[in-house]
């Protein structure tokens, strides 16, 4: 047992450095190509001329597509192992290391050029790769899947500053394939990754800063639960839209570079209306949580961002949709809150409360992982007073979504690439 805890600690350290390496590479490319040192792609887009804002995501997608197509042609005669940690965990626990690194580099290109895709997906993949590489050299084969799971949880903890949510994400998604006794090393890796990440970044701040002054009352629980019902209906719709957009891009029968470039061009066109469509949505979420906009502003940004996310994911841009899903959930919750605020008092507090609820419940509706979704929002914002209400709402959202759409976003992704 001591050996496992020691390895879990090492995996956590490796994962933290993998996440930090990707984050610093991203900041470097943003500084080189966008003259942006703020870390916010929305700020970068705002400061660019319209024509650069239009073309930058398309050029990034084109470069990533050329890289992926070139690698595919170079290795077409070789046997292929998984390049995704979910696939590796469902097979024999092995990665195609070179292809996974190329995929991460392609993700770096589309992320730094403004595509509306999550950077955290590549971070978690690199963390799992680092764990797998270490495990294959120093541990028996039957443990490889455990250490990949530890690496993925640690990467999630370092990326989102949510070690418990990262651990439970692995447990919920892999329920039935991983015994509860294995959760100990996963938690150790996640916590160590968070601590090392805090040391590297010289900060232990929460991911999102929220000023929620409301004390949750009976009325608020009713609103939270109703938001869960709404998210349970919206989750399957979002998954269906993503699947339809992917099929639409595939039906065009474009070469990968042009397909990714088209997705980037759509993001560029949308950014002419609002720069907020650039990036994974983190800075937009923070601005909404700091000062919730008016109903029509939320609606406009939501529609543009939703189209950008669908274009980016549908075109096959390598990256995650975890953080974009958080923004979509926030916007749905805030739209619901603003609408209720027309009749109820404390409209600002209701909007903020239901925005946070929307983040958790839409995440639960798309991942079918309600416990993880609840803990993630609490860990990212520090609003643990919401935990009881969010847990109920997330379970409701997950049940409704699972009833309407059998596959979660991860099962849908696996089926799409199998």
UniProtKB/Swiss-Prot annotation:
Keywords noted in UniProt: Cell inner membrane, Cell membrane, Chloride, Chloride channel, Ion channel, Ion transport, Membrane, Transmembrane, Transmembrane helix, Transport, Voltage-gated channel
Keyword Acetylation in annotation: no
Periplasmic topological domain: 26-53, 167-177, 243-257, 312-315, 373-379
Gene Ontology terms describing biological process: response to acidic pH
Major place of residence: membrane
Membrane topology: Multi-pass membrane protein
GO MF entries: voltage-gated chloride channel activity
Subcellular location, record wording: Cell inner membrane
InterPro entries: Cl-channel_core, Cl-channel_volt-gated_ClcB, ClC, ClC-type_chloride_channel
SUPFAM superfamilies documented for this protein: Clc chloride channel
Residues on Cytoplasmic side: 1-4, 75-145, 201-221, 279-290, 337-351, 401-418
One cellular-component annotation, GO: plasma membrane
Function: Probably acts as an electrical shunt for an outwardly-directed proton pump that is linked to amino acid decarboxylation, as part of the extreme acid resistance (XAR) response.
Annotated family: Belongs to the chloride channel (TC 2.A.49) family. ClcB subfamily.
HAMAP family: CLC_ClcB
NCBIfam families, sorted: PRK01610.1
Protein name according to UniProt: Voltage-gated ClC-type chloride channel ClcB
């Amino acid at each position: 047992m001591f050996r496992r805890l020691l390895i879990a600690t090492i995996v956590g350290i490796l994962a933290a450095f993998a996440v930090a390496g990707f984050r610093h590479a991203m900041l470097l490319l943003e500084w080189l190509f966008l003259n942006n040192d703020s870390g916010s792609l929305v700020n970068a887009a705002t400061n660019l001329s319209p024509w650069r804002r239009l073309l930058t995501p398309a050029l990034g997608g084109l470069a990533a597509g050329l890289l992926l197509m070139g690698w595919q042609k170079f290795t077409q005669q070789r046997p292929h192992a998984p390049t995704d940690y979910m696939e590796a965990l469902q097979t024999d626990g092995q990665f195609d290391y070179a292809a996974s690194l190329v995929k991460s580099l392609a993700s770096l290109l589309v992320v730094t050029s403004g595509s509306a895709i999550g950077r955290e997906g590549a971070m978690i993949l690199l963390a799992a790769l680092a764990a797998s590489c270490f495990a294959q050299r120093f541990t028996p084969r039957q443990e490889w899947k455990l250490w990949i799971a530890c690496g993925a949880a640690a990467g999630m903890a370092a990326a989102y500053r949510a070690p418990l949510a990262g651990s439970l994400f692995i447990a919920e998604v892999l329920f039935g394939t991983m015994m509860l006794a294995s959760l100990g090393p996963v938690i150790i890796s996640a916590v160590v990754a968070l601590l090392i990440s805090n040391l590297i970044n010289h900060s232990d701040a929460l991911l999102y800063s929220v000023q929620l002054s409301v004390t949750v009352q009976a009325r608020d629980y009713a609103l939270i639960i109703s938001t869960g019902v709404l998210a349970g209906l919206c989750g399957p719709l979002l998954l269906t839209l993503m699947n339809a957009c992917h099929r639409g891009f595939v039906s065009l029968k474009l070469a990968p570079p042009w397909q990714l470039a088209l997705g980037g061009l759509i993001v560029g066109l949308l950014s002419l209306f609002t720069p907020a469509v650039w990036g994974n949505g983190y800075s937009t979420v923070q601005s909404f949580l700091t000062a919730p906009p008016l109903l029509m502003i939320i609606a406009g940004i939501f529609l543009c961002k939703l189209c950008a996310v669908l274009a980016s994911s549908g075109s096959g841009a390598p990256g995650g949709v975890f953080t974009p899903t958080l923004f979509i959930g926030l916007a749905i919750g805030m739209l619901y809150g603003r609408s209720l605020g027309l009749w109820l008092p404390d409209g600002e507090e209701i909007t903020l409360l239901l925005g946070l609820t929307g983040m958790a419940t839409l995440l639960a509706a798309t991942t079918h992982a309600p416990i993880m979704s609840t803990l993630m929002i609490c860990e990212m914002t520090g609003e643990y007073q919401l935990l009881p209400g969010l847990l109920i709402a997330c379970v409701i959202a997950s049940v409704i979504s699972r009833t309407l759409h059998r596959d979660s976003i991860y099962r849908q992704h696996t089926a799409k690439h199998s």
